[in-house]
Regions:
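Membrane-interfacial helix termini and adjacent extracytoplasmic/periplasmic loops
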Residues: 20-24, 64-67, 73, 122, ...
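Interhelical loop and adjacent transmembrane-helix boundary motif
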Residues: 4, 25-30, 61-64, 73-84, ...
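Hydrophobic alpha-helical transmembrane segments of multipass integral membrane proteins
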Residues: 43, 90, 94-106, 110, ...
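C-terminal transmembrane helix and the adjacent membrane-cytosol boundary/short C-terminal tail
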Residues: 2-16, 22-25, 33-36, 121, ...
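A structural signal for multi-pass alpha-helical bundles of membrane permease subunits
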Residues: 49-61, 141-152, 219-224, 232, ...
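Transmembrane-helix boundary motif in ABC transporter permease subunits
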Residues: 22-27, 97-129, 142, 146, ...
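Transmembrane alpha-helices
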Residues: 36-37, 42-49, 173-177, 183-185, ...
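N-terminal, non-cleaved signal-anchor transmembrane helix
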Residues: 1-90, 94, 275, 280-286
Length: 286
């Protein structure tokens, strides 16, 4: 007797009938909770920036720009009206550019040395690179102050610049070294197979490939230098940078021009990001 091997036909599915499984907690979290939490995080991040931009068009009655009074563009047309603000802003921009140049030049050389060469103390060098990033700014600022006082350095622009280059250097080294480590060595080998010497290979192959990492490290170093307050406060003496001016203004009254500068900084950063996205898309299409 043979067993019946025939199977019963599957039940027909009506047109329009859903074949998806019923929703559960996991599906609800994926479709509802995660987007809600993501929206709240974005709101938490960008709401202060929105408030800064809105209050840059405010005309406060008193010294503090904390309550909306009326719409005005006076702060935008008279940016340098508060005494000393534009001087502090100009000094911070100059220090940011100089600190970026110093940190990028030194950091790029250090990154190539650590990434491309094997030498005694290489592991210790990697550890030393990360130490300024892991050191609290209060500790770094006080240590630099002790060093400058011991060497009888007059605190001012020079000491601020040395301090900024020192703590920006680590971020540059880490960023550029990661870019160098991700390069394909076969590209340089192919250039040398085509009779290119080491200098030509570096400037025609290696440097263009590392350049995006150098640009990113430059932007990061400039942002860190321009925005720094703690280390600068320890080593500035009587010199006033823009973050120090903002801190002092918060004690005696915040003019709306500070909000204007913050709005301009956000718009410039946004423009840089948009330009980078456009360039990246064009390169991807090419």
């Amino acid at each position: 007797m043979s067993a019946d091997t025939t199977t019963s036909p599957a039940a027909p599915v009506k047109v329009g009938q859903s074949t998806k499984r019923p929703g559960g907690p996991v599906r609800w979290v994926r479709e509802r909770l995660i987007p809600i939490l993501g929206s709240l995080v974005l709101l938490y991040m960008f709401l202060p920036i929105f408030v800064v931009i809105v209050f840059s068009f405010n005309l406060p009655n008193g010294r503090f720009n904390y309550q909306w009074v009326q719409f005005s563009t006076q702060a935008w047309t008279n940016l340098c009206a508060p005494g000393g603000m534009c001087d502090a802003l100009r000094l911070s921009l100059i220090l940011g550019v100089l600190a970026t140049l110093g940190a990028v030049i030194l950091g790029t050389l250090v990154a190539f040395g650590i990434a491309r060469y094997r030498f005694r103390g290489r592991s210790a060098s990697n550890l030393l690179v990360f130490m300024p990033m892991a050191t609290p700014e209060v500790v770094m600022g006080s240590a630099l102050l002790t060093w400058f006082v011991t060497l009888t350095f007059a605190r001012g622009i020079t000491t601020i610049l040395i301090a900024h280059v020192m703590f920006c250097l680590s971020f540059v080294v880490v960023t550029v070294k990661a870019r160098i480590a991700g390069l394909d060595p076969r590209l340089e080998q192919a250039a040398m197979d085509l009779y290119a010497d080491e200098r030509t290979t570096f400037w025609k192959v290696t440097f263009p490939l590392v350049l995006p990492g150098i640009v990113g490290a430059s932007l990061l170093a400039f942002s860190l230098s321009f925005d720094d307050f703690i280390v600068t406060n320890f080593n500035s003496g009587s010199t006033v940078t823009f973050p120090m001016y903002v801190w002092g203004a918060a004690q005696r009254g915040t003019p709306p021009q500070i909000n204007v500068v913050g709005s301009l900084m956000f718009l410039v950063s946004l423009a840089i990001v948009l330009v980078a996205q456009v360039v990246q898309r064009r390169r991807a299409k090419a």
